[in-house]
Amino acid sequence: MSGRGKGGKGLGKGGAKRHRKVLRDNIQGITKPAIRRLARRGGVKRISGLIYEETRSVLKVFLENVIRDAVTYCEHAKRKTVTAMDVVYALKHQGRTLYGFGG
């Protein structure tokens, strides 16, 4: 046994961490057309120009809450990979039950 724990099957060398790009302003990746498409799916005909930034901020808060809960479930199970079921349970915890992803 190489002392890698239960997940390590010799994948990679386990050396120094690579430099990661600093993540900021990723919320701008939710583009104006993407927000427009979501609104169209919801039945909206015309969209005010102020909606886009507001939508991004609301979406960011929502995702932060869901991801925080999902990571909590993942850590409790002593896993490092967030599964679809973690997200389903996180949404259920917030009162937004999601069907179709197991469980």
Swiss-Prot record:
Cellular localization per UniProt: Nucleus; Chromosome
Modified residues annotated as N-acetylserine in this record: S2
Location of region: Disordered: 1-20
Signal peptide: none
Molecular function per GO: DNA binding; protein heterodimerization activity; structural constituent of chromatin
The keyword Acetylation is annotated on this UniProt entry: yes
Positions bearing N6-acetyl-N6-methyllysine: K6, K13
PROSITE patterns: HISTONE_H4
Pfam families reported in the protein's UniProt record: CENP-T_C (PF15511)
Residues modified to N6-methyllysine: K21
UniProt keyword annotation of Aminoacyl-tRNA synthetase present: no
A GO cellular-component term linked to this record: nucleus
Keywords: Acetylation, Chromosome, DNA-binding, Methylation, Nucleosome core, Nucleus
DNA-binding region (UniProt annotation): 17-21
Entries under Gene3D superfamilies matching the protein: Histone, subunit A
The organism's place on the tree of life at top rank: Eukaryota
Family under the similarity heading: Belongs to the histone H4 family.
Protein name: Histone H4
